[in-house]
Amino acid sequence: MRQKLVIGNWKMHGSLAANAALLEGIKAAPARARLAVCAPFPYLAQCQALLNGSQVAWGAQDVSAEARGAFTGEVAASMLGEFGCTYALVGHSERRTYHGESDAVVAAKALRALEFGIIPVICVGETLAQREAGETEVVVGRQLQAALDALSVEQLGRVVLAYEPVWAIGTGKTASSEQAQAVHAFLRAEVRERDAGVADRMAILYGGSVKPDNAAELFSMSDIDGGLIGGASLKSEDFLAIGNA
């Protein structure tokens, strides 16, 4: 049975003082799920220091597809690896939308993360217009296929997927548990076409306005293995409640 995984995405929030209080609150209480936080780059060293020796992992919100060089503003996977980074989000809808990241770039970022022992959390999801046009499976299938084409079976076995319907991120809207389960089942079936064992073991997270009051229902679905949490990850009590859902 796959253990639940709950990853907090702080996005562009935080301060040294607020982070310290949040991290101390998270690591002080037990959770049924595995927990991790993805913090802004300037705070990764703080996460490393405060979470060292705890059961809470930490990660980055992005990683460069490039190994090194004249790429101002980029952060290399090798740099994250030196800090002991566990996870890196790749292909979050906000990166795809605001920075024009293509499926190929997302796959390249996943490959680079894996090269340095970092688990890429590959995010896929459709807009409201795409859902209403009946294109959900076409869109998320295309996004996933880029990774399937780029990764070996062994590499794929070290990946986490996250389904984040763009229309449900930060809007207060949430896909129903049945809607989310249908997409998660589709994604797992696509991975199974490549390797059944990998598909059965892979964590597929749901991200889209997950809160303490809807987490249990979402997480009860057979193919939903946890959550990628935005706003609710900024309050330790909410994040822990989701981790215990």
Curated annotation (Swiss-Prot):
It is an enzyme of class 5 (isomerase). One of its GO terms (biological process) is glycerol catabolic process. Substrate binds at residues 9-11, 170, 209, 230-231. PANTHER family: TRIOSEPHOSPHATE ISOMERASE. Involved in the gluconeogenesis. Catalyzes stereospecifically the conversion of dihydroxyacetone phosphate (DHAP) to D-glyceraldehyde-3-phosphate (G3P). The active site is at residues 92, 164. Its EC number is 5.3.1.1. Pathway: Carbohydrate biosynthesis; gluconeogenesis; Carbohydrate degradation; glycolysis; D-glyceraldehyde 3-phosphate from glycerone phosphate: step 1/1. It is found in: Cytoplasm. InterPro entries: Aldolase_TIM (IPR013785), TIM_sf (IPR035990), TrioseP_Isoase_bac/euk (IPR022896), Triosephosphate_isomerase (IPR000652), Triosephosphate_isomerase_AS (IPR020861). Belongs to the triosephosphate isomerase family. Transmembrane segments: none annotated. Homodimer. GO terms for cellular component: cytosol. GO terms for molecular function: triose-phosphate isomerase activity. This is Triosephosphate isomerase. The keyword Isomerase applies. Keywords: Cytoplasm, Gluconeogenesis, Glycolysis, Isomerase. The keyword Translocase does not apply. It catalyses: D-glyceraldehyde 3-phosphate = dihydroxyacetone phosphate.
